[in-house]
Amino acid sequence: FHENVKDAVKDAELITTLTPSTEGYLDIFDVPNNCHINAVGADAKGKRELMTNVIDGSTNIICDDPMQALHSGELQYNEWPKLYITSLKNLILDNKSMELDNGVSLFDSTGVAIEDIALAIMVYDEYSEEILGS
């Protein structure tokens, strides 16, 4: 257990935020270089976990749905949309890899129901084939 966020993330390679917070509590100055952040909690207007400087200071930003992230994700607090926002779909379809040579990458997840359903089907099919043999 850590007394504060700064101590909790000081040596992290991966940070996942998943709270119902309405105020940013993660500061870019506390995030180590070469760290990846999964921001999951901001999934509606008014919710946030990241201070604006985390978005501004991220080298790569990936979103499950960029337009939805600009409306109800962490990106709703950014004064201008980043030109280098990559959708998760394009990252996968284009078979891209995200190189992180000295910076912070951010995944702003707002939740896309169809992706959740597709993943559930894939997991079920895999489970059925391996465990049930059908």
Regions found by a protein language model. Give the residues of each.
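General beta-strand structural signal in soluble alpha/beta enzymes
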Residues: 1-2, 17, 63-64, 108
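A short glycine-threonine-serine/GTX helix/turn-capping micro-motif
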Residues: 105-111
